Amino acid sequence: MRAPVSSTLLIAAGFSRQFVVNDVSGRIVCDWGGSRLRAFLETGGVIRERCSGPGIGQLEKESPAEALARVLAPWRAHWRIGRIVLCGMAGSRNGLVEVPYVRAPASLAQWRAGAGLVRSGADTLIVLAGIEAQNFRDVADVMRGEETQIFGAFALEPSLAAGRQVMVLPGTHSKWVEVRDGRIARLQTYFTGELFELLSTRSSLLRAGGTGEADEEAFEVGLRNAARFDLAANLFETRSAQLIEGRSAGWARSLLSGLLIGAEVHSMLARGEGQFGPLTLIGDPALTGRYLRALCSYGAEARQLDGELCVLAGLRAASEGLQES
């Protein structure tokens, strides 16, 4: 583990003050992404409570240290917290403390050793590293947070740590990750989630403020068209269908979702990914369900793992190993 870094910002944010009511020791683990913070209080190996807060990318008036101190204050006031372990954007340039990426190929032990350590009063904060790897076009690519889910998946399903596997982690920035014998080898990022948000809220494709219910038929149309035409040629159909055919905003959003997810999945399958057996989808079940439909529609097989269970398993694997460091 990397040497302790300055805790000045954390002390200023309130991490040096801890008034404990419950003498039972606990541990806090956090998945802090760009869009949200998910925190879990664990005692005796059991998740007791959970809470959420703003993502790193949503902070405007608070520093990351101030936001984290505010969100965790109720727990720190009632429990004796031994350590706080964080993954994701907490270790980014705009996070709590910048933790350098661990370069692939990377095993669990190598990734864990790259963690940053911050001590502040009675608190020990461990900020996990991200991964730097070549993508499938031999260009540098990075991720923060998804590696925790991958190593958690190994803990939940040990067979995934054997041989070559391809894991798909949908989200704001979707990741396709090749692992070999339990080591992260390569990764490919797709801008799909953020592109959907931008096109559906800040472009001419959808009416301002238009949402509506999801339409499964429109999603399927998007998947079919994504395999037949270029994405740039497909996109304007979301607007013309509303203007000429009277389609609802919900229908158009579902079409857009199908076009973007379909373009991502179809391009990766065209490379031959998936020919080594079922792909593994990790993430929110609703979102991975959409990717599963896309994969199946193009003739690929996949299994789903719950993203929250994987990130918790990964945070535990990192924390337990660091106790021995």
Q: What are these language model-derived features?
A:
Residues 27-31, 83-85, 165-169, 280:
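Short glycine-aspartate micro-motif
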Residues 27-63:
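Short glycine-rich, Thr/Ser-proximal phosphate-binding strand/loop in the N-terminal lobe
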Residues 59, 132-224:
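Glycine-rich phosphate-binding loop plus the immediately following alpha-helix
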Residues 76-140, 181:
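Short beta-strand-loop/turn "lid" adjacent to the catalytic site in phosphate-handling enzymes
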Residues 198-257:
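Active-site rim beta-loop-alpha module in soluble metabolic enzymes
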Residues 247, 251-273:
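A short, acidic, amphipathic alpha-helical segment used as a generic capping/interface helix at domain edges
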